[in-house]
A protein has these predicted regions:
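Helix-breaking motifs and short loop linkers at transmembrane-helix boundaries and internal kinks
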Residues: 50, 82, 103-109, 247, ...
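Conserved MFS/SLC helix-loop-helix module at the cytosolic interface between two early adjacent transmembrane helices
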Residues: 69-108
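Helix-to-loop junctions at the C-terminal end of transmembrane segments
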Residues: 71-82, 267-279, 362-363
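Helix-loop-helix hairpin linking two adjacent transmembrane segments in secondary transporters
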Residues: 107-109, 137-192, 241
Length: 397
């Protein structure tokens, strides 16, 4: 089991390290806001560009495709670069993609620009978390990772509603321009606060690829792709569930999204705390909790006062993120950059798999709440992969 090599930054004061973590988290906030903002602006984009809302859905898919393609590709291409330089280049690419999206004249260029904006997503998070972990002692590495991921969860709670409000009252183009400005702010903060590390351990593209012949890496990625799908299965259909099952007005939907974001913040912190104490066993506890939450959700959906706590609990399932991310750093000796970036590609597979499975069931005539049962099945699938990973780990130690 390996850990990121201690960096020169470990000699920095706690205050300096906190500023670096805040700079890295700001990048996560920019990415999270850019990824989720369009979901609340689909009608605005459709009306402005003269296309249907399902066509705007393809814009979301283009971004996700960019993440899946860019995470491993850019991690490999940047393997020999200093991490500080790579972070700056990745965030510059993200800023460019969002400014271009804001200026897209028609639908087709917007598809291309969202794909470009998605390319640096996974690689940025992967490298940022390696930097954060390298500054922390072994028993606090998952907590450091969760601080970087906190930017993403705060984006769900604050950034997404802010961008949606800006897009509705001015133009959806201003929402993407705002994301670009936040990305430029991240570039400035990383350039100022993150020092160059001449002793940083470098990897090679061939070394990164060669390390991917180990089963623990693929099992960890599988746990993310399958185990996380349940959260996305339910969350993607939250609005129609509230309207048609809970039978509340559309004004409650932003409140529900904020409750979900609050759950994400709690879950993100809890995931890092658990993994620092339980290591791989934390993944099993999180997946078991996820299964329980998803099984309860269909029963909680019929009342506003029961579905809101259920939505909060759904958000806490994001605890799987920092736990799996840190586990990958442990098992991916020689391929930590590629593995950390690929973890976000796996999460985007979950983001596609969950809604697709839920959509199949709903299109077949089942109730909106069936998403909870389907999600529970995927969480159980993640537990099966955990059992396999646990067996492999015990056999090699």
């Amino acid at each position: 089991m390996s850990h990121p090599a201690p960096s020169a930054a470990t000699s920095l004061s706690p205050g300096a390290i906190l500023l670096i973590q805040l700079a890295l988290a700001l990048g996560g906030f920019a990415i999270g806001t850019g990824e989720f903002a369009i979901m609340g602006l689909m009608p605005n984009v459709a009306q402005d560009l003269g296309v249907s809302e399902p066509q705007v859905g393809h814009v979301i898919s283009a971004y996700a495709l960019g993440v899946v393609v860019g995470a491993p590709a850019l991690a490999l291409l940047g393997a020999r670069l200093p991490r500080r330089i790579l972070l700056l280049l990745l965030m510059a690419c993200f800023a460019l993609g969002n400014f271009a999206s804001a200026l897209a004249p028609t639908y087709e260029p917007l598809l291309i620009f969202r794909f470009i904006a998605g390319l640096p997503h996974g690689a940025y998070f992967g490298v940022a978390m390696l930097v954060a972990a390298s500054m922390a002692p072994p028993h606090k590495r998952a907590k450091a990772v969760s601080r970087v991921l906190a930017g993403l969860t705060v984006a769900i709670l604050i950034g997404n509603p802010l961008a949606t409000w800006l897009g509705q009252f001015m133009s959806w183009r201003y929402a993407f321009a705002l994301v670009g400005v936040i990305a430029l702010s991240t570039i400035a903060m990383v350039a100022i606060f993150l020092p160059a590390d001449p002793h940083e351990e470098r990897s090679s593209p061939t070394g990164e690829l060669r390390a991917f012949n180990r089963a623990p890496i693929w099992l960890a990625l599988g746990m993310g792709a399958i185990g996380f799908a349940g959260m996305f299965c339910v969350f993607s259909y939250m609005a129609p569930t509230l309207l048609h099952v809970t039978q509340v007005g559309p004004g409650w939907i932003p409140m529900a999204m904020a409750v979900f974001g609050a759950g994400c913040i709690v879950g993100n912190s809890a995931g890092g705390w658990l993994f620092d104490r339980l290591r791989l066993r934390a993944v099993a506890w999180i997946l078991a909790w996820s299964t329980l939450v998803l099984l309860v959700f269909p029963f909680a959906a019929h009342s506003l006062w029961s579905i809101l706590p259920a939505i909060f609990a759904l958000g806490t399932m994001i605890a799987l993120g920092p736990a799996l991310q840190t586990h990958l750093m442990d098992v991916a000796s020689g391929a930590q950059t590629l593995a950390a970036a690929s973890n976000h590609a796996a999460f985007n597979v979950a983001n596609a798999l969950g809604p697709w499975l839920g959509g199949l069931a709903i299109s077949a005539g089942m109730n909106w709440t069936v998403t909870g049962y389907i999600g529970a099945a995927t969480a159980i699938g993640g537990l099966v992969l955990f059992a396999w990973a646990w067996r492999v780990q015990r056999a090699t130690h």
